[in-house]
From Swiss-Prot:
This is Cation-efflux pump FieF. Belongs to the cation diffusion facilitator (CDF) transporter (TC 2.A.4) family. FieF subfamily. The lineage of its organism: Bacteria, Pseudomonadati, Pseudomonadota, Gammaproteobacteria, Enterobacterales. Keywords: Cell inner membrane, Cell membrane, Ion transport, Iron, Iron transport, Membrane, Metal-binding, Transmembrane, Transmembrane helix, Transport, Zinc, Zinc transport. The chain crosses the membrane at residues 12-32, 40-60, 82-102, 114-134, 155-175, 178-198. The gene is fieF. NCBIfam families: CDF (TIGR01297), PRK09509.1 (NF007064). Zn(2+) binds at D45, D49, H153, D157. GO terms for molecular function: cadmium ion transmembrane transporter activity; ferrous iron transmembrane transporter activity; metal ion binding; zinc efflux antiporter activity. Homodimer.
Length: 300
């Protein structure tokens, strides 16, 4: 486990938890003063944010533990479980928004002091935007699925705060149902984000292969190595920060065992240089045991 990965992932989880806690307190005050259903939706979403971010923080700490006798491949899959749990949290908040939005659509209420709600929403919008910017940078550096799930969650918050701002402004000018309509629209977007996040988490738990560009990069590395005649049965997956790469290398039949071993070691080191922290397993095949139609090919 790279120290930078652990540091960045932990800092992103802590930042999200701290921001969600602060915004929750601010939104409680704003909702009390305005009675806005959109702000109530934002308040509930902040409660979900705290639960999700705390879950994320605990799971990230667990996933960063090194492999042990009972978990020989490490604990990285915990990140996918965290993302799946987050999708459930977010789906619950979306359903709450639908119920509350429909209720206020048919029984609209006049907002009290919408100026307070607008001020609070502006603060929430810009602070969440800063958090998402930091999370996106962490995801680019670490490819952490847990942080990516959290980022998608807070991206929906940015959209929600923008919609709330418009709804409060319209309500201020007499469009009483705008508050409820925007709450319903926000609910649709949040539910979509939750389903997308859940799909990604399930795919990871099912050991989906690495992206095509990364698999092609693996082939590019080994095909440029002298002495390697071909490769097949490439299998890849990712668990937390660790990529798992397995493949069969095709070598000349007359190559001595020690030379074949050294060649495989060199290819492994080249792959580790391209994908730091990866777990690489290479099987050496004499060309003669490979079916004729597959010899000398570089198969993804």
């Amino acid at each position: 486990m790279e120290p930078q990965y652990a540091r960045l992932v932990k800092s992103a989880a802590l930042a999200a938890t701290a921001l969600a806690s602060i915004l929750l307190l601010i939104k409680i005050v704003a909702w009390y003063h305005t009675g806005s259903v959109s702000l109530l939706a934002a308040l509930v979403d902040s409660l979900v944010d705290i639960a999700a971010s705390l879950t994320n923080l605990l799971v990230v700490r667990y996933s960063l533990q090194p492999a042990d006798e009972e978990h020989t491949f490490g604990h990285g899959k915990a990140e996918s479980l965290a993302a799946l749990a987050q999708s459930m949290f977010i789906s619950g908040s979306a359903l709450f928004l639908f119920l509350t939005g429909f209720q206020h659509l048919y029984s609209p209420e006049t907002l009290r002091d919408p100026g307070v709600g607008i001020a609070v929403t502006v603060v929430a919008l810009f602070s969440t935007l800063l958090l998402v910017t930091y999370q996106r940078w962490v995801v680019r550096k670490t490819r952490s699925q847990a942080v990516r799930a959290d980022m998608l969650h807070y991206q929906s918050d940015v959209m929600m705060n923008g919609a709330i701002l418009i709804a409060l402004a319209l309500s201020w000018y007499g469009f009483q149902r705008a508050d409820a309509l925007f709450a319903l629209a926000i609910g649709v977007y949040i539910l979509y984000s939750a389903l997308r996040m859940g799909h990604e988490a399930v795919q990871s738990l099912l050991d989906r292969a690495l992206p095509d560009d990364e698999r092609q990069a693996i082939i590019d590395v080994i095909s440029s190595w002298p002495g390697v005649k071909g490769a097949h049965d490439l299998r890849t997956r990712q668990s937390g920060p660790t990529r798992f790469i397995q493949l069969h290398l095709e070598m000349d039949d007359a190559l001595p065992l020690m030379q074949a071993h050294l060649l495989a070691e060199q290819v492994e080191q080249a792959l580790l240089h391209r994908f730091p922290g990866a777990d690489v397993l290479i099987h050496q095949d004499p060309c003669s045991v490979v079916p004729e139609g597959r010899q000398g090919r570089w198969e993804l």
